[in-house]
Amino acid sequence: MSNNDGSLLDSDFLNKNPMEIFQQWYNTAKVHEPKSFPLFTLSTVDEMNKPHSRTMALVKYDLNGFKFCSNGNSPKANHLRNNQFASLCFYWPNCQRQVVVEGTTEEMPRHQVEAIFANGTNIEGKITNIALEFQSEPIASYDRVNEKREEIRRWMLFNANSLPCPGYIVGYNLIPDKIEFLKFNENYAHERIQLRRNDDKTANSGNESWIFQWLTP
């Protein structure tokens, strides 16, 4: 993919809400990164303030934030219960772009989580989610995981292939207070812009609820 499809210097870019910019970049990634475009790195901290990162899949995004789901029994869920601050990093190498989001997480209403689970088309992923009630717990062998998956498949045969959303699946919405867009350039003069919510009058005025700053690459 050519990276000459627009510059962060464009005034049209700077006048947009950052979520609109993200939508534009995300749609481009869908075309050029068809298998990995929804993936991001979620970073949280534990009770000892030690960082932890893992790859997640974005479920949805809108003007209110970035949505993703997790096992409520997992370490990351425990991290977010104790510390609601988190960051997301999207990296699309074919597009030569990266987006880093920082903000506060909140749990999504139960009916929204169930709707997301019901509308998901990855049946094998659903089966695995149900089988792995206690995520990240030590196990003696993966044989037990496969046995549990087969038990669920047999259950589906007698229940119209339906899969209810497990109670331990939790949905999160990350409300951004800072979004950074990075466009890699061949001459290493990368373009990097940060949009954030605050009252710093020294920064440039962007969208009505955001201000922007250029950052060195």
Show where each model-derived region lies.
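Binding-site signature for planar aromatic cofactors or substrates
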Residues: 1-217
